């Protein structure tokens, strides 16, 4: 769910997921879609594509369990869809951390300027 995703982003990046990524670029946040503006925005684009592959669970609402061991996210689900959901969220959180150097405040609230993205 959005709760676990937010916790993962905070743990990996140290940034508030809502204020830092909730309206970032063309793809971060619930309403985002469009050609990525930078590597950070591309993380969110890939994340949305990952979500599109999930058919048996709701990424925004369905809860899953994970642990934070030695600064590493460990998904802990037996249900295959929830495990995949956790892995999608884990991947975006790690991607955002790995691309912290591309984060640019000018890309917050950019949605009206987004061009159509390539399909996943």
Curated annotation (Swiss-Prot):
Expressed by the venom gland. One of its GO terms (cellular component) is extracellular region. Keywords: Antibiotic, Antimicrobial, Disulfide bond, Myotoxin, Secreted, Toxin. Pfam families: Phospholip_A2_1 (PF00068). InterPro entries: PLipase_A2, PLipase_A2_Asp_AS, PLipase_A2_dom, PLipase_A2_dom_sf, PLipase_A2_His_AS. Disulfide bonds join 26-114, 28-44, 43-95, 49-120, 50-88, 57-81, 75-86. The keyword Cell cycle does not apply. The keyword 4Fe-4S does not apply. It is found in: Secreted. GO terms for molecular function: calcium ion binding; calcium-dependent phospholipase A2 activity; phospholipid binding; toxin activity. GO terms for biological process: arachidonate secretion; defense response to bacterium; lipid catabolic process; negative regulation of T cell proliferation; phospholipid metabolic process. This protein corresponds to 0.8% of the venom protein content. PANTHER family: PHOSPHOLIPASE A2 FAMILY MEMBER, PHOSPHOLIPASE A2, MEMBRANE ASSOCIATED. Snake venom phospholipase A2 homolog that lacks enzymatic activity. Shows moderate cytotoxicity against C2C12 myotubes (activity above 200 ug/mL). Also shows antibacterial activity against both Gram-positive and Gram-negative bacteria. A model of myotoxic mechanism has been proposed: an apo Lys49-PLA2 is activated by the entrance of a hydrophobic molecule (e.g. fatty acid) at the hydrophobic channel of the protein leading to a reorientation of a monomer. Monomer. Belongs to the phospholipase A2 family. Group II subfamily. K49 sub-subfamily. This is Basic phospholipase A2 homolog LmutTX. It comes from Lachesis muta muta.
